[in-house]
Amino acid sequence: MNTSAPLQNVPNATLLNMPPLHGGNSTSLQEGLRDFIHTATLVTCTFLLAIIFCLGSYGNFIVFLSFFDPSFRKFRTNFDFMILNLSFCDLFICGVTAPMFTFVLFFSSASSIPDSFCFTFHLTSSGFVIMSLKMVAVIALHRLRMVMGKQPNCTASFSCILLLTLLLWATSFTLATLATLRTNKSHLCLPMSSLMDGEGKAILSLYVVDFTFCVAVVSVSYIMIAQTLRKNAQVKKCPPVITVDASRPQPFMGASVKGNGDPIQCTMPALYRNQNYNKLQHSQTHGYTKNINQMPIPSASRLQLVSAINFSTAKDSKAVVTCVVIVLSVLVCCLPLGISLVQMVLSDNGSFILYQFELFGFTLIFFKSGLNPFIYSRNSAGLRRKVLWCLRYTGLGFLCCKQKTRLRAMGKGNLEINRNKSSHHETNSAYMLSPKPQRKFVDQACGPSHSKESAASPKVSAGHQPCGQSSSTPINTRIEPYYSIYNSSPSQQESGPANLPPVNSFGFASSYIAMHYYTTNDLMQEYDSTSAKQIPIPSV
């Protein structure tokens, strides 16, 4: 690999602005330092491009094929079509454009590269890069609109989403085609590197404005989402104080009722506005006003509510961390290329450092396309676990050692059954993230299990219906382990507190507040007086 010969023919690659050294070998020292820097840049970019080709192609291919799986044949929302387009753009960048860029790195002189290859590389890299950024910006605006509570009652139709997608494709590749056609014959086979004068500089300026606008939209949107989610988590930890008449104890379930019979609307953060929370609150408070003399809910259901609230708060914190990761990845991967493009617009003369910065910037922007499926996809957690599993066993293979695992039987029964239970709990992310319930509270909430312990105690509290759920399975394991902002939009079957089955039509927020303010033993005994056996009340 000859690193000095191509750079000498590059019009944008001049010598480093180094102070002159005493002696006749100052030029040789400069050339040696320049060759060392360029070699280090090539090694770093090649290593990152290998990671992009392997991990990025795998992740985007899995995400792209998931939309054509029979179980996901119908999109959850129309906006999922944007995720499909994003995965296609990133798959093309990681699988086709990144190997082409690797070829360009080792043959920097355009004299050794066919013109058709340079034209294809210019068009695909410029078009798909800006298209991927526009898709990410549109998804960020959609999620910000959803979190801020400005999502309309009816989602956008598929025709509107399709028109928006076609508009983004048209604008992106029109700009890329103009930039490719206006490229002068150069010794560099890099996009935007030859647009140095006349109309080429105007097209480069337009490309820089579009690139900068997309990066700014993504960064600002996810910063605002993170702030909203952080405030939402703080509100959940510190519930509002409501003045209650102590002379007349309020019922534990349902919303508090004013003198004129209207239920008090509990204020919630903006995250739940125009979502299923308001529907749940309205239906439950309305049901309470009609059925105020119903049976009080048992203590096990109150424990389930507390677990759901803690689970939702944990998801808020996890969503904040994800927003921070998205902002950092966008800034780190997009700023080097943006700085090099701005420098090309402002100055007519390039430099050797600018050329290295441009190479590293294109590598990082391709690396961002490799990271997208592990951040934006619906099954991003599963992809990350598989990659970590592969890296762990690859490292163990290099160290020539095996990881010894011992299977310990869980309770009584067949070893094969316990092995299946153990593997199910280790791979079920909802079980790992949800709070671990006690066995007796699960039996009290869902009826007797099929274990031997429950068979030995045939007495069951009155009012409980058996649901046939094993005691080893947690409550509500179908809760999705990630927040709705991780997906393109909230599903029609929302997860979290709104997805819990209402018991005797009680209000969610008022039950949560009542758990904090009505904890006296006399009141609890009055609520559980209908049970045949007193159920111990957990500390909240």
Curated annotation (Swiss-Prot):
GO terms assigned for molecular function: C-C chemokine receptor activity; G protein-coupled receptor activity
Keywords of this entry: Cell membrane, G-protein coupled receptor, Glycoprotein, Membrane, Receptor, Transducer, Transmembrane, Transmembrane helix
Keyword set includes Coiled coil: no
Residue intervals passing through the bilayer: 47-67, 87-107, 121-141, 161-181, 206-226, 319-339, 351-371
Topology, Extracellular side: 1-46, 108-120, 182-205, 340-350
Coiled coil (UniProt feature): none
Residues exposed to the Cytoplasmic side: 68-86, 142-160, 227-318, 372-540
PROSITE patterns: G_PROTEIN_RECEP_F1_2
Annotated Pfam families: 7tm_1
Subcellular location: Cell membrane
Any GO CC annotation of this UniProt entry: plasma membrane
Membrane topology: Multi-pass membrane protein
S-S bridge residues: none
SUPFAM superfamilies (alphabetical): Family A G protein-coupled receptor-like (SSF81321)
Protein family (similarity comment): Belongs to the G-protein coupled receptor 1 family.
Function as written in the Swiss-Prot or TrEMBL entry: G protein-coupled receptor that is activated by the chemokine CCL5/RANTES. Probably coupled to heterotrimeric Gq proteins, it stimulates inositol trisphosphate production and calcium mobilization upon activation. Together with CCL5/RANTES, may play a role in neuron survival through activation of a downstream signaling pathway involving the PI3, Akt and MAP kinases. CCL5/RANTES may also regulate insulin secretion by pancreatic islet cells through activation of this receptor.
Official protein name in the record: Probable G-protein coupled receptor 75
Lineage: Eukaryota, Metazoa, Chordata, Craniata, Vertebrata
Originating gene: Gpr75
